[in-house]
Structures are given as structure tokens and as C-alpha cells.
Amino acid sequence: MSGRRSRSRQSSGTSRISEDQINDLIIKLQQLLPELRDSRRSDKVSAARVLQDTCNYIRNLHREVDDLSERLSELLANSDTAQAALIRSLLTQ
């Protein structure tokens, strides 16, 4: 009983999200992940796996952005064309 009271006190000042809303968000995340998007609807994937795969996917995207930024910087540093100057100015804005 005290556990229920403490939970209700903790959430009284914040908006609550229903279990159905959480499940809908998990399904939406699953549809965004390439590895899980292709799994059949009948295949039940746990929410924990969806969240873990989402975190891994975001980390990989960050790494790709960092790598591409580095490659672009190297290409622009080695190029003295007007187009490269324009791209450099756009990137520093």
C-alpha cells in the first residue's frame, strides 16, 4: 500500500504516460531501426531490445557524422576552389 502511495506522490506533479502510449512509441522506434524494421509483425521484439538497439543506432549515427565531418574537413582543406571556399563559409555560419 505504501508503495502505491509513494508512486502516486512521485507522479502527481508530472504528466503520466499510459502503457499503451509507451507501447506505441516502442513500435514507432522499432519502425525507424533498419535491423528491426524488417522483422515480421508476428515477431515480438522486447521493449528492452528496441531501446538498446535505438541507443546503438544513435551511437553509430554519431560516429558516422564525426567520420564524414572529418573527411569533409580534409577535402576542403586540400581544395582551393571557389566552391570549396563557399562550402567552408557556409559551414562556419
From Swiss-Prot:
The keyword Iron does not apply. GO terms for cellular component: cytoplasm; nucleus. InterPro entries: bHLH_dom (IPR011598), HLH_DNA-bd_sf (IPR036638), PRE (IPR044293). Expressed in root and shoot meristems, and young siliques. Low levels detected in all aerial tissues. Pfam families: bHLH_ILI. Gene3D superfamilies: Helix-loop-helix DNA-binding domain. One of its GO terms (molecular function) is transcription cis-regulatory region binding. Residues 6-61 form the bHLH domain. Induction: Not induced by exogenous gibberellin. Keywords: Brassinosteroid signaling pathway, Cytoplasm, Gibberellin signaling pathway, Growth regulation, Nucleus, Transcription, Transcription regulation. PROSITE patterns: BHLH. Its main location: nucleus. It comes from the Eukaryota. It is found in: Nucleus; Cytoplasm. One of its GO terms (biological process) is brassinosteroid mediated signaling pathway. Atypical and probable non DNA-binding bHLH transcription factor required for MONOPTEROS-dependent root initiation in embryo. Promotes the correct definition of the hypophysis cell division plane. Transcriptionally controlled by MONOPTEROS. Moves from its site of synthesis in pro-embryos cells into the hypophysis. Regulates brassinosteroid (BR) signaling by sequestering negative BR signaling components. May function as positive regulator of gibberellin signaling. May play a role in the regulation of light signaling and possibly auxin signaling. Homodimer. Interacts with BHLH 147, BHLH148, BHLH149, BHLH150 and IBH1. Interacts with SIEL. Plants over-expressing PRE3 show long hypocotyls, pale green and slightly narrow leaves, elongated petioles and early flowering. They are not sensitive to the gibberellin inhibitor paclobutrazol during seed germination. This is Transcription factor PRE3. The gene is PRE3.
